[in-house]
């Protein structure tokens, strides 16, 4: 999809851009694959805020996505490419020959009318899902499982891709979008191709109100708060933070401080750590 830019007819329009949605073929989702989605506003079951900067936004319905891709040996035809408000990637509605309908993540190059398939015998072509042991070395993949049968957990956002680098026994070596190289069980599944909607990262939100439509609330600087609200707060005027390193609102070091648990069980599968 192309980026649509606007003339500066107002302060909010100046610099703003949107996607032109040329790839989207319908604005009416499949009703049988919709589920209600209740807003949490960043609160847990006790009503306490656990995630800041969330709340409000346009009402949404959840699209049930097939991340498992476990419908083996049954071909399906791409019926539509649709917008999904719950993720950065677009989704594709698949009509299988046995009558079932499922949504999948729409990879780059997938078009209406194309046929896709899942299973060990599927061809190596965009949109097909196979066990990692059946995918040739060097192939670009997405929607990668970490546990067989659990469904894809890695490489699912717009424009994301990973590459299969090699095979060693029961494991395959995969380079992820972050630069991390890690081993994944060879019986886990992945989908061929790169996730579509590559231009998503080029969109300029343009104004605060558009962020609010997306359910994003303002991010207030700690230095603009009082000292009882943030370690950076207080002082006369624009005072320095008064500490040797930046802190989170709860007094923990931040901005570069590593938060991954030491000696985590999955460390042995990571060959090369991700880039900063």
Curated annotation (Swiss-Prot):
Keyword tags: Ribonucleoprotein, Ribosomal protein, RNA-binding, rRNA-binding
Record-stated family: Belongs to the universal ribosomal protein uL2 family.
Cellular component annotations (GO), alphabetically ordered: large ribosomal subunit
Disulfide bonds listed in the record: none
PANTHER family: LARGE RIBOSOMAL SUBUNIT PROTEIN UL2M, RIBOSOMAL PROTEIN L2
Cited function: One of the primary rRNA binding proteins. Required for association of the 30S and 50S subunits to form the 70S ribosome, for tRNA binding and peptide bond formation. It has been suggested to have peptidyltransferase activity; this is somewhat controversial. Makes several contacts with the 16S rRNA in the 70S ribosome.
Organism: Halalkalibacterium halodurans (strain ATCC BAA-125 / DSM 18197 / FERM 7344 / JCM 9153 / C-125)
Quaternary structure and interacting proteins, as annotated: Part of the 50S ribosomal subunit. Forms a bridge to the 30S subunit in the 70S ribosome.
Family matches, as Gene3D superfamilies: 2.30.30.30, Nucleic acid-binding proteins, Ribosomal protein L2, domain 3
Molecular functions (GO terms): rRNA binding; structural constituent of ribosome; transferase activity
UniProt xrefs under InterPro entries: NA-bd_OB-fold (IPR012340), Rib_uL2_dom2 (IPR014722), Ribosomal_uL2 (IPR002171), Ribosomal_uL2_bac/org-type (IPR005880), Ribosomal_uL2_C (IPR022669), Ribosomal_uL2_CS (IPR022671), Ribosomal_uL2_dom3 (IPR014726), Ribosomal_uL2_RNA-bd_dom (IPR022666)
Pfam family, one: Ribosomal_L2_C
Classification via SMART domains: Ribosomal_L2, Ribosomal_L2_C
Gene Ontology BP term (one): cytoplasmic translation
Official protein name in the record: Large ribosomal subunit protein uL2
Renumbered residue ranges of the record's region Disordered: 36-58, 214-276
């Amino acid at each position: 999809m192309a980026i649509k830019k606007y003339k500066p007819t107002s302060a909010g329009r100046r610099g703003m851009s949107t996607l032109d949605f040329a790839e989207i073929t319908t604005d009416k989702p499949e009703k049988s694959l919709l589920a209600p989605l209740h807003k949490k506003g960043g609160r847990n079951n006790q009503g306490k805020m656990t995630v800041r900067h969330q709340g409000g936004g346009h009402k949404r319905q959840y699209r049930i996505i097939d991340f498992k891709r476990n419908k083996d040996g049954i071909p399906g035809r791409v019926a539509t490419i649709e917008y999904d408000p719950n993720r950065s990637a677009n989704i594709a509605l698949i009509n299988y020959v046995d009558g079932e309908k499922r949504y999948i993540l729409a990879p780059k190059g997938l078009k209406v009318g194309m046929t896709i398939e899942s299973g060990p015998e599927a061809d190596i072509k965009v949109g097909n899902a196979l066990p990692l042991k059946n995918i040739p070395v060097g192939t670009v993949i997405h929607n990668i499982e970490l546990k067989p049968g659990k469904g894809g957990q890695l490489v699912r956002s717009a424009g994301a891709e990973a590459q299969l680098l090699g095979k060693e026994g029961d494991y395959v070596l995969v380079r992820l979008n972050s630069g991390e190289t890690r081993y994944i069980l060879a019986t886990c599944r992945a989908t061929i191709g790169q996730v579509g909607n590559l231009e998503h990262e080029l969109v300029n939100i343009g104004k605060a109100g558009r962020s609010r439509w997306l359910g994003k609330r303002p991010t207030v600087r700690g230095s603009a708060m009082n000292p009882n609200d943030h370690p950076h707060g207080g002082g006369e005027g624009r005072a320095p933070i008064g500490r040797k390193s930046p802190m989170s609102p709860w007094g923990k070091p931040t901005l570069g401080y590593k938060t991954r648990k030491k000696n985590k069980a999955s460390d042995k599968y990571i060959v090369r750590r991700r880039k900063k």
